[in-house]
Amino acid sequence: MKRTFVALVALCATITSIAQDNLSALMPMPNHIEHPKGRAWHIIEGRTAVEQPADSLLFIAETIADIISQRTDVPVSIAQKGKKADIKLCIDNTLEGAEHYRLQISQRGITLSGSTAAALFRGAMTLDQLLIGDVVATAQDRMSPIIIDDAPRFACRALMLDPARHFLPVKDVKFFIDQMAKYKYNVLQLHLTDDQGWRVAINSHPRLASAKHYTQDELREIVSYAAQRHIEVIPEMDIPGHTVAILAAYPELSCSHLKEDTVVVGHTTNRMVCAANNKSYEVLTDVINEIAPLFASPYIHLGGDEAAVPANWAKCADCQEMMRKAGYTEATQLMTPFFDRILAAVRVNGKKPILWCELDNIYPPANDYLFPYPKDVTLVTWRNGLTPTCLSLTKKYGHPIIMAPGEYAYFDYPQWRGDLPEFNNWGMPISTLENCYKLDPGYGREAEEQSHVLGVMGTLWAEAIGDVNRATYMTFPRAFALAEAGWTQLEHRDWDSFKVRMYPNLTDLMKCGVSVRVPFEIVERK
């Protein structure tokens, strides 16, 4: 870590364009900034305090006090109730949008207003970056006048962790959430089940849980921790494929021609729960009934991707009989009755379903959905090269869409040559920082043609990500680029500006013990 940190400092010194001012660490770039004339605000020990807010905003007030104290070494407290102070935060109902904030710094102090508590928290993160960027002023315990009026381009800015492949302890998930929050991410998706493991305790079916798993109380703890930082946690249970962990515990859920096969978690692949087996629906409904109350999010992600239908349902006598009765000619048509029954359990629990967007071909060209998705499903695009088609189809059929195109947003892909020396047998494509920055979630479409885009998601599939240090290494700095794609309007995005603002944030993450990748390749050799 020490050698990497020294290297980063040396690298930063070579970037002659870096201007140390109060904009040089803003990430993502705000959408409106003013520089009013006036004197700086001075942070004075014993006098600087945060005006006590409503109880619901106390955590944000304490966060602001901690930020200023840590950046300046000047103790900042919360003022006693009823006493005026030079740092104020309040809800302003005239600000439109769920995350619209206004941050004003003047000689008299700081005023942070927001449309919601979430908006105020986003503004607090901007305040922190102002202090990181203006190192000279911060060292002198002062802040320059500025007005930032800001709101996100897209409502959803998400990252996905995959503890199903490699388990992450609760403390590491919290650590990852802390880093997400700094860059205005507001959704964490947890991929909790896959062929390599089932990571959530299910009381009605205790055999499901792998040796390493989250108790239901631990998941509630993660949800609560994220909620304090205004991050929504969405659970993902991947079905009907990616279900080896289920079948290892309950082999009777296999298709008829595979019931005698031994299923080994982490080794067996391409197995699916049987669409014609009522027991499949009983178990999965029980699972949904237990998972749904653990998460405050209105969504449950149910996967639906990479289902090996030809090796399972197409060869299963029971599934073939189900097809015959329904008048189906293709085994993939069974996805419709399968998800009809599963999504009924989701709706009964007051939740909305999310699925990965699968088309009738896994490579371009593709023409239509793999099967007709129900109207209330939100889809996530992911397959390389198919996002433009997914974008058009979801607009045509009226489905909201989240953009996680593999060529831009798959953070498990290596960032440069040799980036995954211990795991390079898949031939995964390189996804550079600059390439990630090029993502326009609207794909250049007219406003109406991208109006159904909810936002972006960066995915960290964990076959090669064994711990949280590798997770953050693969995430940063690419998550800076994705955060800006989700938050900042296109006209305010600029690659050269981004590079300048990236370095102070990388340095700050490293000071916090976060493993990052230093992108030496983007610096021109002198």
Task: Indicate residue ranges for each PLM-predicted region.
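Active-site neighborhood of glycoside hydrolase catalytic domains
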Residues: 261-264, 268-378, 382-398
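Feature activates predominantly on carbohydrate-active enzymes
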Residues: 95-301, 315, 320-321, 341, ...
